[in-house]
């Protein structure tokens, strides 16, 4: 039974009125804690966290799962 997670954090949005300040930190904190608990964790942060890449990574996470696996998708952003 595998433990797998993806942690996504987006601070920077187009323009500067919609920017956030703690989302990347949140994703990194989650990733660190899940890693301590035995999860295999990947992260997507800021510009690397495009809609297409998020969908691709979640699909990969789900399709690689087998019965009994635990999956976590954590998102911090708008």
Region roles according to the model:
Residues 1-78:
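Boundary/activation segment at the start of structured domains
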